[in-house]
A protein has these predicted regions:
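Short E/K-rich amphipathic alpha-helical oligomerization segments
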Residues: 58-76
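Short, surface-exposed, charged amphipathic helix/loop patches that serve as local interaction elements
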Residues: 17, 43-64
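Flexible domain-boundary/linker segments
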Residues: 28, 65-69, 91
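Small-residue hotspots
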Residues: 49-50, 57, 86-96, 100
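Amphipathic alpha-helical coiled-coil segments with heptad-repeat character
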Residues: 43, 50, 72, 76-79, ...
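Extended, charge-rich alpha-helical interface modules
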Residues: 78-87, 91-94, 112-117
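Conserved short "hinge" loops at termini or chain/domain junctions
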Residues: 1-47, 94-117
C-alpha cells in the first residue's frame, strides 16, 4: 500500500498509537517512518495493523520489564501484569490478521462492451 496521511492516521487509530495534542510522532511507539514501513509491506490496512500489534507486543515486553509490583516503606505499587498486556497485544494482532484475510483487496475488471447490430 502507498502511505498517505489518511492511511497513517487510520493505522495509528487501529494501533491505539495516536499522536497527542501538541505532540509529534516521537511521542508514540511508532514513528511516521515505522507506520510507512508497515503500510508499504502490507496488502491492506488490517494486515498492517496485525503486524503493528505483533511489534507492539515485543515493545511492551521491553518497556514493562519483569517488575510487577514493588513497595517502598508503607507504600505498595502494583503494575499491570506483563503477560496480560502481551496477551492483549497478540489478541489484537490475531483479530486484525483475520480481518486482513477476509478483507477483499483490490479487484481489476475489464469489461468489453457488446457489439450492437
Amino acid at each position: 500500500m502507498t502511505p498517505t496521511a489518511e492511511l497513517r492516521t487510520k493505522l495509528r487509530k487501529l494501533l491505539d498509537e495516536q499522536i497527542p495534542a501538541g505532540g509529534s510522532d516521537a511521542d508514540t511507539r511508532f514513528l511516521d517512518t515505522d507506520i510507512d514501513e508497515l503500510l508499504n509491506e502490507a496488502t491492506n490496512i488490517y494486515e498492517a495493523a496485525a503486524t503493528g500489534w505483533t511489534l507492539k507486543a515485543a515493545m511492551l515486553q521491553r518497556e514493562l520489564g519483569q517488575v510487577e509490583s514493588y513497595s517502598v516503606g508503607q507504600e505498595r505499587y502494583d503494575m499491570r501484569k506483563l503477560q496480560d498486556m502481551v496477551n492483549y497485544a497478540l489478541k489484537m494482532a490475531e483479530t486484525y490478521s483475520r480481518m486482513a484475510a477476509s478483507s477483499m483487496g483490490s479487484v481489476i475488471l475489464r469489461i468489453q462492451p457488446p457489439e450492437v447490430l
